[in-house]
């Protein structure tokens, strides 16, 4: 009897030890992909291939993780990730060619909602309301960020792209889509009505607000492939938000479509498009565009680290996956390091 009791106790202890061992040491902790811990890179992927992805660069520790969304959700993201916006604790992923916005947790990248929008490009949040440029329908979709439902739409110009909220107004860049447009729609966010249409240069793309409150918009210019003589040059346009007066600085030789501003809001960075010889830096007080790029190279997009001014330049290659890179430059323009990312990186976003 004592032997049986001893054997039973020994077996129980062995099982308990084994269970504890399995719980504590053999189970590897899951990687937590917190989008607020660095810079999130939107990789478009190849059109029609459903291989859009997210890369996460950790600023503390200088490491990079690729394919973050797929790893967390065990699912493909979709076709062409155009941009990413953070609103409160959620990340909104504009999956352009899939006609949807994927909503994930900011802290884990775990998906919890999907919103149908025709050709979503960019989004800006104003309180509990999201405004999304819907390129396909020439409108801005209005999204309730509490329910993640589309509640309305606002008709604007053709091919709406970047947008920004400033002083109770929403500014929308109408790029022209496959045609030609040179306007910025101004919308009152209280009524969601267009209150002004401003003429700028051809093909406005993206905005920035400087330390003086002026609104800058980069315009790529119009390219007429049939009659090149009808093509127009790019420009940086400065809008006075009080009077809506516009002043222009011409950009010759290429068609810029990306615009960023430093944390002091006194220096603009533009470029990041096909044909651009690099990324340019311009003081907001300048009256003419710089002759030479601040960082030379062929970049599809870029981002500025607000904490140290480093430039994160994106190199895209649609044929060779290993050639898609983020190139990190110091605030003075010196190259620091390269990192392999997903296919078609177009920008980076700092959400911390």
Model-found features: residue ranges?
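C-terminal motif of bacterial Sec signal peptides marking the signal peptidase cleavage site
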Residues: 15-19
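Sec-dependent N-terminal signal peptides
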Residues: 6-13
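Predominantly soluble domains enriched in secretory-pathway, periplasmic, or organellar proteins
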Residues: 4-6, 21-352
């Amino acid at each position: 009897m004592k032997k049986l009791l001893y054997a039973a106790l020994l077996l129980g202890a062995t099982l308990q030890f084994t269970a504890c061992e399995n719980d504590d040491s053999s189970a590897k902790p899951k990687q937590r992909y917190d989008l607020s811990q660095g810079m999130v890179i939107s990789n478009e992927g190849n059109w029609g291939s459903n291989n859009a992805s997210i890369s996460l660069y950790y600023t503390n520790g200088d490491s990079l993780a690729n394919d973050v969304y797929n790893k967390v959700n065990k699912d493909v993201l979709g076709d062409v990730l155009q941009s990413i916006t953070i609103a409160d604790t959620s990340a909104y992923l504009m999956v352009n060619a899939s006609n949807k916005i994927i909503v994930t947790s900011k802290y884990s990248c775990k998906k919890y909602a999907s919103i149908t929008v025709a050709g979503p490009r960019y989004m800006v949040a104003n309180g509990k309301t999201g405004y999304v440029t819907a390129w396909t329908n020439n409108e801005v979709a209005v999204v309730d960020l509490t329910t993640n439902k589309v509640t309305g739409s606002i008709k604007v110009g053709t091919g709406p792209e970047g947008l920004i909220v400033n002083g109770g107004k929403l500014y929308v860049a109408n790029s022209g889509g496959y045609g030609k447009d040179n306007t910025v729609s101004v919308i009152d966010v209280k009524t969601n009505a267009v209150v002004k249409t401003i003429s700028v240069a051809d093909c406005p793309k993206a905005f920035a607000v400087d330390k003086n409150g002026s609104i800058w918009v980069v315009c790529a210019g119009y390219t007429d492939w049939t009659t090149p003589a009808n093509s127009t040059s790019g420009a940086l346009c400065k809008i006075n938000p009080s009077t809506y007066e516009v002043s222009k600085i011409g950009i010759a030789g290429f068609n810029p479509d990306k615009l960023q501003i430093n944390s002091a809001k006194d220096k603009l960075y533009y470029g990041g498009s096909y044909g651009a010889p690099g990324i340019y830096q311009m003081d907001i007080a300048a009256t003419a565009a710089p002759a030479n790029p601040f960082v030379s190279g062929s970049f599809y997009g870029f981002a500025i680290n607000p904490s140290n001014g480093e430039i994160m330049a994106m190199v895209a290659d649609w044929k060779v996956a290993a050639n898609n890179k983020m190139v990190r430059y110091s605030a003075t323009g010196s190259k620091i390091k390269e990192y392999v990312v997903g296919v078609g990186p177009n920008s980076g976003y700092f959400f911390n």
